[in-house]
Amino acid sequence: MAAALLARAGGSLGRALRARDWRRLHTVYQSVELPETHQMLRQTCRDFAEKELVPIAAQLDKEHLFPTSQVKKMGELGLLAMDVPEELSGAGLDYLAYSIALEEISRGCASTGVIMSVNNSLYLGPILKFGSSQQKQQWITPFTNGDKIGCFALSEPGNGSDAGAASTTAREEGDSWVLNGTKAWITNSWEASATVVFASTDRSRQNKGISAFLVPMPTPGLTLGKKEDKLGIRASSTANLIFEDCRIPKENLLGEPGMGFKIAMQTLDMGRIGIASQALGIAQASLDCAVKYAENRHAFGAPLTKLQNIQFKLADMALALESARLLTWRAAMLKDNKKPFTKESAMAKLAASEAATAISHQAIQILGGMGYVTEMPAERYYRDARITEIYEGTSEIQRLVIAGHLLRSYRS
């Protein structure tokens, strides 16, 4: 599957990536300069986004349209299964490459970015790490080429940040598990062909009694709730999953009974790198929009960029963006080196999401009235940015994660 992406990027990229030369980069502080292979990948994804996403992003947002054709093309390029090994039909790349690609896709369309992020990080990620060989063949390979996508069902109407308080239950009956309960805010839900679901199998053990399951969609006993009418990322669907005596085979248990909370937390660590990358794309698009407008808009006889106040705004925007990008790359590199990265992924997600919100806000300020109308994309960037501070752990949760790791390091 990676062949199309590598061919699009050029022969030298293909040869280098196949030889895994890019793995030599991954000494975390070795360099902040991307190797040539990753630079070529970035350009390939930027070209795709400029051609396939930018021209239709406003329409997708306005009409709440899922980008079916574009997602299929992304699958053919390997963008929906970037760190999945080639023997499972994935692209076989690393998480740094994934972060770079996701930023560029999100720069073109944030909704398409989150569709890509959920399939890579939240759906394929836990199956790749915890699934059996048979599960990987059944639940990963068909989801790599864009024909099918998956979703991730953890949050519930009564608990979002408190992931260990699952009220959805799963009980054993013969050769089956029977699921009951409701999952909320599930991205990709209306288009998904499968989901990773977390349910309590032993309530007396609290979070140690949570297990993870693989559920095909559609399936008897599983109903989709209404599509939520959202502030932003409108081209991606969000809905509840309602389980009413939903029966699945016993072999659809992911990992061991009681491993669900561990699986969820480790998956969110990966997912936060994805959301940080999505936020970077929104932030970069906002900065691009602001600079382009300020260069061409004249006031007091000169372009806005000649005004010191505008220059200060642009400098602060660039500083926040570059700082968050380096944090995100560091988290990705740590993961690629099989080092702990929970704190670093939380830092990246927090910094990038807050940067995206702040930068998109300042972009509207620079555009003035033009920033408030749909004729310009700045207002869409602002709406899209806001969710990055909420899903896959709010900013408040990220601060708790960071502080917890920080304090433990001082006590050890």
UniProtKB/Swiss-Prot annotation:
Superkingdom assignment: Eukaryota
The metabolic or biological pathway listed in the UniProt record of this protein is: Lipid metabolism; mitochondrial fatty acid beta-oxidation
- What residues does the transit peptide encompass? 1-24
Q: Where in the cell is it found?
A: Mitochondrion matrix
Names of required cofactors? FAD
Instruction: Report the top EC class in one word.
Output: oxidoreductase
The record lists the catalysed reaction(s) as: a short-chain 2,3-saturated fatty acyl-CoA + oxidized [electron-transfer flavoprotein] + H(+) = a short-chain (2E)-enoyl-CoA + reduced [electron-transfer flavoprotein]; butanoyl-CoA + oxidized [electron-transfer flavoprotein] + H(+) = (2E)-butenoyl-CoA + reduced [electron-transfer flavoprotein]; pentanoyl-CoA + oxidized [electron-transfer flavoprotein] + H(+) = (2E)-pentenoyl-CoA + reduced [electron-transfer flavoprotein]; hexanoyl-CoA + oxidized [electron-transfer flavoprotein] + H(+) = (2E)-hexenoyl-CoA + reduced [electron-transfer flavoprotein]
Paired cysteines (S-S): none
List Phosphothreonine occurrences by residue: 27
The chain residues annotated with the modification N6-acetyllysine are: 51, 72, 129, 208, 262, 292, 306
Q: Which GO terms describe its cellular component?
A: mitochondrial matrix; mitochondrial membrane; mitochondrion
Q: What is its EC number?
A: 1.3.8.1
Active-site residues, record numbering mapped to chain: 392 (proton acceptor)
**Subunit notes for this chain?**
Homotetramer.
Query: What family classification does the UniProt entry report for this protein?
Result: Belongs to the acyl-CoA dehydrogenase family.
The identity of this protein, by name, is Short-chain specific acyl-CoA dehydrogenase, mitochondrial
- The protein's organism comes out as Rattus norvegicus
